Amino acid sequence: MGTWTREELEREFDLYKARGAAGDWSAWADQFTEDATYVEHVYGVFEGREAIRAWIVKTMSTFPGNEMPLFPVEWHIVDEERGWIVAKIWNRMQDPGDGSVHQAYNFSLLKYAGNGLWSYEEDIYNPASFADMIKAYMAVKGK
């Protein structure tokens, strides 16, 4: 058995999802340890909670992040031995006005550090899929 129970890992992942849904990205960054690492394959590697906060607040307050309010989780796996969560998360744009859905997915690896904090996140995705999704969204929205 690992350091944390499945129940604790599930509870903290539920909070992680709720914080993302709330859209308060500064508060969202508070769920990481002070020395956390965040690996984002397009934007780079962020070391420390404050670096994560600066990046996520900027990214989610400018296009396209500011029009991407929904992050439904299709599935997730709990690795109790390691304290890890692996999830398939959709990044969904707001309704462009015609009811169409524009989204692309990533796989996220989260490593739990205890006390309600994550020490690591890595988002793995195909940037070309995101670019195609954004182009289709903009075509419908008329940007």
What are these regions (language model features)?
Residues R11, M68-L70, H102-A104:
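Short solvent-exposed loop/turn micro-motifs enriched in small/polar/acidic residues
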